[in-house]
């Protein structure tokens, strides 16, 4: 590791192969927590490259437990986290809307690292079993068109990174890598990042990892979700090309809400918020979910504009289909 660390500290990027080999050394338990921490901090100070992200993602995905699903055209909408906005679980709530709208959602996530409630925490509060074996998860996905994939349970290699990440308490390359390593092969993806400087880079990494279409979003203030306030920036991967865009709520037919109005709490509180949204209760939480689900429909290619995606999201919720999708998952991802 010494040579790689010196290279990074000198401001030079590691190749994909170098990163892949170093990641495999970590996965095999050959490096100490201190060595892993120094490596993560050095990468953060230098700035992560596409080759480093790709090499790490390939190593971690290869080490993941495979999900033997029969479904194709899978999508995920998880974000990097680390924005410290303390919002409710936006992408998790939106996942039910997307699944109800006909998108095969392989929702990948974890417990909270820097927030009060991660996707795993809120879904566990809703009665979802985080620890089903891979074969059962595949059955749930095939039947419901939605499954929650608990990263901690499906990425045994993460046990070497998690304690270090908790102690560092800062976003690292691991936040950027998490959304890239879904155990189910993805065709499309909506990926939220708290790093607007990495929008184009992340979209190109997704292209290299085989995504057919993807959208990488950073909201106002570095939120890793689309925000119905301020300016949103995104990179769109479409037809093999990456383009950069921006929009405000008014540009997609929405009124602005305040950040304070979408703050969440601990898992039980966020679970109630999620249910209220799917029950179509008018609120800033609903508007934020509609925006992000609409963006997801657009990222998936199901609609030809963000505005059309928002309209579809409103329709799906109003018809009760999103709430029914929650009930379906609660009935199947149990035991």
UniProtKB/Swiss-Prot annotation:
Binds 2 magnesium ions per monomer. GO terms for biological process: L-tryptophan biosynthetic process. Mg(2+) 1 binds at residues 91, 225. It holds the Pfam family Glycos_trans_3N. The keyword Cytoplasm does not apply. Mg(2+) 2 binds at residues 224-225. This is Anthranilate phosphoribosyltransferase. The lineage of its organism: Bacteria, Bacillati, Bacillota, Bacilli, Lactobacillales. The gene is trpD.
